């Protein structure tokens, strides 16, 4: 009940118990406001009703310096965050408070972060390709406009860099609105991303940042904030979708959302499930993923980085995410070890729309032929390791040579990695990608050594680099 006042009776880490009059017990997911002695406001979300007017709540910020006996006020509704054009070009925390030092947000509407997904009859599914400008993704695992894509990888294989490049490409080439949720990742990366977005420009007047909303709940935040920050970003994205816009939602990293849920679950005293995860893992993931959907008014296209613990794809966290996705981009450590970035595994990455009726017969033919050549090269590796390349048939030697060129040609200079590679980023349209790989498969560049294919845009760049070296 709004305005009901209770008293904090127990504090265990970020979980606290508060006692209210029994006929005024706050509802599940209601936000409680607590004024600390230092004048700061602490918000906690009700998770359990224990009976007798006692509720268990999870704090959204640190409980340091909090004492038993302080007053807790029931706001009567879930955490509500600002939505609308005033949020563009701003940086928020889980509560929707600006953290960029730019003053109060100009918002006329606030929405609760817990909302039902759109009704089934309002949802819309399209099978339209979404161009990213990244060759390996556009050819092998094309994104669906209004679909969900997961970027899977272990530690340090380049998930965040791929996400950052997608943000930069999409903002420049597609001129849509983007919402970025930093969930439990490094504050340094978040800071770098904000500065890069401010520097990148769509045109003379408009920065990429001016069309982006950023919401952060980083590694140092309590688990409650990390668990709810994705819902805050989702609520802001839903507003633009419902206004008829096409929105991009980036989540880095969805595994940290699961990890925060696991921490909260343990603090609430729930019995853990397999590998120590929360028993509600599937439900929590479903509640978030079902809201990331397109309606007849507008679309939300989402790209989610998924950390894979110890490179184990059978771990319950990445396995639960898999079932919700239209396309999966798998980053492989062995490819990164060869110095090929983005380290996408073209044999393990998949897309629902790699279908001749959607992408076209030529795109489908080239993609499948590239995969066939790479698979044959993979099958031959044991023979090569034992007997050497010289013992292969002429056909197999040609397959190996082309496969090695394809592997290297899948690498690409990124705009956001310019300071590492020393090369300006390249955006390659899908038509050029398909044409370049078709020419490579046809044997047009069999005479060019494989090292010239590394970190190039289109095939013409490879030919130019080769001819320049011969002068």
Swiss-Prot record:
Q: Would the keyword Protein transport be found if you checked this record's keyword annotation? A: no
Keywords of this entry? ATP synthesis, ATP-binding, Cell membrane, CF(1), Hydrogen ion transport, Ion transport, Membrane, Nucleotide-binding, Translocase, Transport
Pfam families the record matches: ATP-synt_ab, ATP-synt_ab_N, ATP-synt_VA_C
* Quaternary structure note: F-type ATPases have 2 components, CF(1) - the catalytic core - and CF(0) - the membrane proton channel. CF(1) has five subunits: alpha(3), beta(3), gamma(1), delta(1), epsilon(1). CF(0) has four main subunits: a(1), b(1), b'(1) and c(9-12).
Please give an example of a GO cellular component term from this record.
Answer: plasma membrane
Q: How does it sit in the membrane?
A: Peripheral membrane protein
Q: Which reaction does it catalyse?
A: ATP + H2O + 4 H(+)(in) = ADP + phosphate + 5 H(+)(out)
The kind of enzyme this is, by top-level EC class, is translocase
Where does the protein end up? Answer: Cell membrane
Signal peptide residue numbers: none
Q: Name one GO molecular function term.
A: proton-transporting ATP synthase activity, rotational mechanism
**What is its biological role?**
Produces ATP from ADP in the presence of a proton gradient across the membrane. The catalytic sites are hosted primarily by the beta subunits.
Q: What is its main location?
A: membrane
> What is the protein's species of origin?
Roseiflexus sp. (strain RS-1)
Q: Which family does it belong to?
A: Belongs to the ATPase alpha/beta chains family.
Listed EC numbers: 7.1.2.2
Q: Where does ATP bind?
A: 153-160
Name-wise, this protein is ATP synthase subunit beta
